[in-house]
């Protein structure tokens, strides 16, 4: 009887124990080169002359951060004039005179700016406009470039997608970003923009809750503004519980830039954190998801303080996702975006979206081409796990939605 030739040949071992013969064995990596794990824990704020005597306990107090926020060009000048020349100061003053957003910067952010190279710094570009860098606005620009108000059945509630609503609960933030899509409503009036009023009033909220309760197709709600960091603890509970009590609402998220620009609030505002935790826990018991969405844009925004704050949220079972804005000179280089995504993953923040910069007045110097976004996304894919790789999207002008 003939022997089956396949059975006659012994199978070569799949695993080769001789590591020297494995062609693609990766070399050992110097731990110091894994930069996304090296989060600064120094007293970086003491480089600012005005805060050189501020101790760690004081700096980590969210009330101190709020009290000492930079809220005017004059206050900014007083704080940084020893670090920069008069030409830079004049440039900033010219920038704010032409900007659609009021001035508000937390000490945490201001201290993270590299004041040796402020013109090129990725954090400075997001928060401090320079007159010398402002470019002519895009010809298709409108103040509400995404058409949010056109899809608002009641003031401050946008219902664009079939099963999702955007609830703008208030119109203030702990900082004001240059690139804010809602510069038509957020913050104080400026020389350039008279704002739409979206105050946190009972009457306006009631109209929004009534609409959402009557639209049975709604399952997903984004609570934004403004910024949910500015909600009081009882407001967090009220909004959360009223949404949880609507049977067809299955999930919602509080949107806040807070963890990126004032992470110490999570560590020291116990009432706010407890209120958020209560809503998340109640939602989980009902089979509903409540999450926190935040907005880190540059690796330098992620510090040891960020890690401590996100660690507290992680321990409490609160999911945190990140939505970045793709900006020229901030995060439009592949290496920067890889570093950002890995740092976020390292502190248990899920990189979720990267938005191509919207049409916003006074920010053409920050906008990139869509093609540049495609290039960076291609480089980012494969650099880390797929579930830690953000999706790049364009929110089309005029109300077209995400693409």
Question: Residue ranges of each PLM-predicted region?
Answer:
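Flexible, acidic/Gly-rich N-terminal and inter-domain linker regions that tether
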Residues: 1-160
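N-terminal pre-triad scaffold of radical SAM enzymes
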Residues: 105, 150-183
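Conserved, mostly hydrophobic/aromatic
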Residues: 109, 177, 352
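Short glycine-rich or small-residue beta-strand-to-loop segments that form or flank ligand, phosphate
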Residues: 167-168, 222-225
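Iron-sulfur (Fe-S) cluster-binding segments and ferredoxin-like electron-carrier domains
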Residues: 180-193
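Short cysteine/histidine-rich metal-coordination sites, predominantly Zn2+-binding motifs
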Residues: 193-201
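Conserved AdoMet/S-adenosylmethionine-binding subsite of the radical SAM
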Residues: 202-220, 229-384
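C-terminal accessory regions of radical SAM enzymes
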Residues: 375-403
């Amino acid at each position: 009887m003939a022997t089956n030739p396949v059975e006659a040949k012994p199978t070569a071992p799949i695993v080769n124990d001789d590591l020297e013969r494995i062609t693609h064995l990766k070399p050992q990596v110097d731990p110091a080169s894994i930069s996304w794990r090296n989060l600064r824990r120094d007293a970086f704020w003491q480089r600012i002359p005005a805060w050189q005597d501020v101790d760690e306990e004081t700096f980590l107090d969210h009330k101190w951060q709020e009290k000492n926020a930079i809220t005017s060009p004059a206050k900014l000048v007083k704080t940084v004039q020893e670090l920069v020349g008069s030409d830079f100061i004049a440039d900033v003053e010219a920038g704010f005179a032409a900007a659609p957003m009021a001035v508000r910067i937390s000490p945490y952010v201001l201290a993270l700016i590299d004041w040796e190279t402020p013109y090129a710094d990725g954090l400075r570009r997001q928060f401090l406009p320079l007159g010398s860098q402002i470019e002519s606005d895009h010809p298709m620009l409108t103040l509400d470039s995404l058409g949010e108000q056109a899809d608002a059945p009641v003031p401050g509630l946008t219902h664009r997608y079939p099963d999702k609503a955007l609830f703008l609960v208030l119109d203030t933030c702990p900082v004001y970003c240059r690139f804010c899509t809602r510069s038509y409503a957020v913050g104080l009036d400026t020389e350039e923009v008279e704002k739409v009023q979206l105050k946190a009033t009972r009457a306006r909220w009631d109209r929004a809750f009534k609409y959402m309760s009557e639209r049975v197709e709604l399952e997903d709600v984004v609570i934004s503004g403004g910024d949910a960091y500015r909600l009081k603890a009882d407001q967090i509970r009220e909004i959360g519980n009223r949404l949880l009590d609507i049977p067809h609402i299955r999930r919602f998220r509080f949107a806040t830039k807070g963890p990126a620009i004032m992470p110490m609030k999570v560590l020291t505002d116990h009432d706010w954190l407890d209120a958020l935790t209560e809503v998340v826990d109640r939602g989980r018991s009902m089979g509903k998801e409540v999450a926190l969405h935040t907005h880190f844009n540059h690796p330098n925004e992620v510090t040891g303080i960020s890690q401590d704050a996100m660690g507290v949220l992680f321990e409490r079972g609160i999911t945190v996702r990140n939505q970045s804005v793709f900006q020229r000179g901030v995060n439009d280089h592949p290496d920067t975006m890889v570093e950002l995504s890995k740092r976020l993953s390292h502190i248990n923040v899920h990189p979720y979206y990267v938005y191509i910069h919207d049409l916003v007045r006074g920010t053409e110097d920050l906008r990139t081409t869509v093609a540049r976004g495609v290039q960076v996304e291609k480089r980012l894919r494969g650099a880390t796990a797929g579930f830690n790789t953000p999706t790049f999207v364009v929110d089309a002008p005029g109300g077209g939605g995400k693409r």
